Amino acid sequence: MRLTSEARSIIVNRIADFSIEVGKQPVTIGQWLYMRPNMFLKIENYIPLKKFVQTDNIDDLFEFESEEEKETLLNKYRTLRYEQATTNTTLKE
């Protein structure tokens, strides 16, 4: 799993603003970008990431190796549950 090139570019260009938003040092954000991209799946980091990249689509933020990896990581960090809880969609019958 890794961030898409577009998402990574936005964070790199605005790393100071993003680090203030998440309350971490820019060096820490830099390590996350290249060595620990799963840290962006934590809800406290995921919400600012969506705000900075200006998208609600998980596939615009991350590139996963497989659907199994995607499902496993989204469930582990409860990102999928958060997305479902905040989405205001109703099923039409």
Locate the predicted segments by residue.
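Secretory-pathway ectodomains
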Residues: 1-2, 21-25, 49-55
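A short, Lys/Arg-rich alpha-helix, primarily the initiator
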Residues: 1-21
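Short, basic-rich loop-to-helix N-cap that marks the start of a DNA-contacting helix
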Residues: 35-51
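A generic structural signal for ordered secondary structure
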Residues: 17-22, 41, 46, 61-62
